[in-house]
Amino acid sequence: MKPGIHPDYHPVVFQDTTTGKMFLTRSTATSTRTVEWEGKEYPLITAEVTADSHPFWTGDRRIVDSAGQVEKFRRRYGTR
C-alpha cells in the first residue's frame, strides 16, 4: 500500500442499539465516545442494525402493517 493515501484503520467496538451486544473489529470509522474492552479503551460506534439483530441473520420475521395503509387509501379514494 502507498503510504499517506489510506485512512487510519484501527480497532473499534461496534454496539447494536437494538440488542446491546458489542463486538470488537477494525474499521476506519471514528467516534468521540469510547468504551473499555478487556482493559483497553476503544472508540465506540453505535449501529441500529447488525448481524445480531438483522432479521436475515436471526431468522425472525417482522410483519409490516400495510393493512393500515390500504385502509387509508380506500378512505381517501374509495373503492371503484
From Swiss-Prot:
GO terms for molecular function: structural constituent of ribosome. GO terms for biological process: translation. One of its GO terms (cellular component) is ribonucleoprotein complex. InterPro entries: Ribosomal_bL28/bL31-like_sf, Ribosomal_bL31, Ribosomal_bL31_B, Ribosomal_bL31_sf. Keywords: Ribonucleoprotein, Ribosomal protein. It holds the Pfam family Ribosomal_L31. Belongs to the bacterial ribosomal protein bL31 family. Type B subfamily. NCBIfam families: L31 (TIGR00105), PRK01678.1 (NF002462). Part of the 50S ribosomal subunit. HAMAP family: Ribosomal_bL31_2. This is Large ribosomal subunit protein bL31B. It comes from Mycobacteroides abscessus (strain ATCC 19977 / DSM 44196 / CCUG 20993 / CIP 104536 / JCM 13569 / NCTC 13031 / TMC 1543 / L948). The gene is rpmE2.
